[in-house]
Amino acid sequence: MAMESTATAAVAAELVSADKIEDVPAPSTSADKVESLDVDSEAKKLLGLGQKHLVMGDIPAAVNAFQEAASLLGKKYGETANECGEAFFFYGKSLLELARMENGVLGNALEGVHVEEEEGEKTEDESLVENNDNIDEEAREELREQVYDAMGEKEEAKKTEDKSLAKPETDKEQDSEMEKGGREDMDISKSAEEPQEKVDLTLDWLTETSEEAKGGAAPEGPNEAEVTSGKPEQEVPDAEEEKSVSGTDVQEECREKGGQEKQGEVIVSIEEKPKEVSEEQPVVTLEKQGTAVEVEAESLDPTVKPVDVGGDEPEEKVVTSENEAGKAVLEQLVGQEVPPAEESPEVTTEAAEASAVEAGSEVSEKPGQEAPVLPKDGAVNGPSVVGDQTPIEPQTSIERLTETKDGSGLEEKVRAKLVPSQEETKLSVEESEAAGDGVDTKVAQGATEKSPEDKVQIAANEETQEREEQMKEGEETEGSEEDDKENDKTEEMPNDSVLENKSLQENEEEEIGNLELAWDMLDLAKIIFKRQETKEAQLYAAQAHLKLGEVSVESENYVQAVEEFQSCLNLQEQYLEAHDRLLAETHYQLGLAYGYNSQYDEAVAQFSKSIEVIENRMAVLNEQVKEAEGSSAEYKKEIEELKELLPEIREKIEDAKESQRSGNVAELALKATLVESSTSGFTPGGGGSSVSMIASRKPTDGASSSNCVTDISHLVRKKRKPEEESPRKDDAKKAKQEPEVNGGSGDAVPSGNEVSENMEEEAENQAESRAAVEGTVEAGATVESTAC
């Protein structure tokens, strides 16, 4: 039972599978048929659309349509299939028309441009522009006046510019200096009253301290004066910021050497009025009767400079010197006005107890520092006001102190210095008042001498400037190198451009032109149509030959064009009637090809045959018009078209005949010139003239032939004797003569140079002998001619 159940199950499974197989539908070719029908219909539509564009003159659209149709049919049937012949033919025809359009042979090369619309737009634009003929005389005069006014304004502007340029730059500088001088006068006038009051107070205080110093005892040893300049209350700004500087307190302390007691302390406060400080202010040393005071306004951390004074000095000299100095300072500060200068610090310094300088006094200064010496009045003298930049000769405090060793002449020297300083200050004040606001701003440059620090800074500035110049030069050299690199790049660029141009040319060469592509398409269509034996296919092949001939004419291959037209004509004569218009067209194209190839006789013959075909066609159409009374409109229209073609063809015939005549004339002229050039060297007149010339030289007295020979001896070319023999020949002759002179037999072996020289002489002698022989032969020939 189990076996039977399994067998039935297997049979049932086989039946089910068979049913399933029968239910599966068989593959059908309906889809392929639909696709093929779609391709064929699409190709036909594209062909019709392309022909429509071709008739309408839209050549690029026609080319695209025919190209797509040919590609569809080529993919389906193959490129050499019969179904593709028509598409290839029309595609090649449209490409030919496109090439003609691009070359400017027929139509406008621009796509979709209508000449009529352009002309209309031009007329509209021209109407908007004013015409010179339409302008009245009044309008012209107004325009002229406007032009003249504009020209005059331009000339005036040029003159003013020239005048402004002609002004010297000093005017501008003076203006700026005037403004600066006015500002400085305002600042000085405000601060002039305060220093005077402060000076009075300081002098009173100094007198009190001097009296106390007199009462004090001096038990031991010399005094040591240390001048300390305290830190300024405010930091000194740069000259660019132009800020004022607060006053400095100078403390003068007298100490004992070797642990001795202090005799007294003198504090001298020097009030400086606010002033504009330059970048580097010099150290001002004021010296009076052995007192050395150093004011250092620039440094923020001033140092203590001790002054060693050796020995004691009588108190009387100190008192008298202090009193005289105080009086001089009061007279100067009270009796004169403050000059308007940039830097005019007024310093009043009095030492309460200062001893005169004796021999062996030592003053410690900063190493290498020069301090310009100013007079006691403390004011900037004439150079500071007038602008005279003659510097004051710097002297160190040591030199000043050594000069004042003799106590007797100290007062006289101080007075001699104070008197001219006062006179100079008075003169400077008067000059400053006369000058007014026109004081030059360059006064500050001559007011102070340059300290060594200034020199060091100047040297540093020069070094920095040199470095900057070197940097600039380096940048310039780098820039020049970059420019050279850029120039090299620009030089390399043309090479790259040349390569690009070459590559473009190669690409253009690789890209097939429209004429070449048209030739390929038409040739392929010709092959496809020629293998078909039907009349329609053969006529298409004839048309393919015709278009191939036109392509050859466009490419100026006239021989190939004649062959193509001739093959087209042969096919058309087989399948067409004698009065068909296609024959007339072929004859016309063939005549053009002959004319381009300078075969005017054949061209005239082909044009005349074309006229015959057209006349035959007109006769046939006239007969058809007579027969068909109602439907004669089409025939009449064709007759009119043919009549319009006849004058053009006749004109071509006349042109060919005229060119033939001109060609014949040119050919005759060319032949004549060639004949004249060939016979010009052998004219009979030349020989006669030479004979007559020789005959005229004959003697008339009947002399013998020997006399004739002697008469024509001038015709014989004589040997030319060299004027100066070469040094080589002289050396050779000397070399030959030397062995004979020395007693030799002359059979000495010559050297290599002598052998070469001998060979050269022999060659020259042979050439001369040949020339003489030729001359004698010519003379004999002339004698024979004269004898005859």
UniProtKB/Swiss-Prot annotation:
InterPro entries: NASP-like, Tetratricopeptide_SHNi-TPR_dom, TPR-like_helical_dom_sf, TPR_rpt
Residues recorded with modification N6-acetyllysine: 33, 243, 288
Tissue expression pattern: Isoform 1 is testis- and sperm-specific.
Disordered as annotated region, ranges: 114-139, 151-507, 678-788
Main subcellular location of this protein, as a coarse class: cytoplasm
TPR repeat coordinates: 43-76, 542-575, 584-617
Keywords of the record: Acetylation, Cell cycle, Coiled coil, Cytoplasm, DNA replication, Isopeptide bond, Nucleus, Phosphoprotein, Protein transport, Repeat, TPR repeat, Transport, Ubl conjugation
Modified residues annotated as Phosphothreonine in this record: 123, 170, 390, 464, 477, 490, 683
GO biological process, one term: nucleosome assembly
DNA-binding among keywords: no
Cysteines joined through disulfide linkages: none
Region annotated Histone-binding, chain positions: 116-127, 211-244, 469-512
Annotated PROSITE patterns: TPR (PS50005), TPR_REGION (PS50293)
Crosslink position(s): Glycyl lysine isopeptide (Lys-Gly) (interchain with G-Cter in SUMO1): 736
Motif Nuclear localization signal per record, residues: 716-722
Subcellular localization, as worded in the UniProt entry: Cytoplasm; Nucleus
Pfam families in alphabetical order: SHNi-TPR, TPR_8
UniProt feature, compositional bias: Basic and acidic residues: 151-201, 252-278, 400-415, 721-739
Top-rank taxon, per record: Eukaryota
Family, as annotated: Belongs to the NASP family.
Subunit structure: Binds to linker H1 histones. Interacts with histones H2A, H2B, H3 and H4. Interacts with histone H3.3. Interacts with histones H3 and H4; NASP is a histone chaperone that stabilizes and maintains a soluble pool of histone H3-H4 dimers. Interacts with ASF1A and ASF1B; the interaction is probably indirect and mediated by H3-H4. Also binds to HSP90 in the cytoplasm; this interaction stimulates binding of NASP to H1-6/H1T.
Function of the protein: Component of the histone chaperone network. Binds and stabilizes histone H3-H4 not bound to chromatin to maintain a soluble reservoir and modulate degradation by chaperone-mediated autophagy. Required for DNA replication, normal cell cycle progression and cell proliferation. Forms a cytoplasmic complex with HSP90 and H1 linker histones and stimulates HSP90 ATPase activity. NASP and H1 histone are subsequently released from the complex and translocate to the nucleus where the histone is released for binding to DNA.
Protein name, UniProt field: Nuclear autoantigenic sperm protein
Name of the gene encoding the protein in the UniProt record: NASP
